[in-house]
Amino acid sequence: MIKFDERLKELRKEKGVTQREIAEFLGIKTRPYQNYESGDRRPDYEKLVALADYFDVTTDYLLGRD
């Protein structure tokens, strides 16, 4: 089962966007987003849903429950 941080990084690279671009979309600074990709932090529910919408995937997929 793939972990959330790995899935998030994989999706970002597939879409060809930077961490900064996604952070701006979420309305946060780049560092907190980097913490999501490094596994140091998890987004709150609202940000998780926003990420799923951004990448056009389900929250289950993001969380590695595919």
Where are these regions (language model features)?
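Residues that mark the N-terminal boundary/hinge immediately upstream of a DNA-recognition element
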Residues: 7, 18, 44-47, 58
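Residues in the recognition helix of alpha-helical DNA-binding motifs
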Residues: 11, 25, 36, 65
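Alpha-helical residues within the helix-turn-helix
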Residues: 13, 24, 53
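Short alpha-helical DNA-recognition segment
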Residues: 17-35
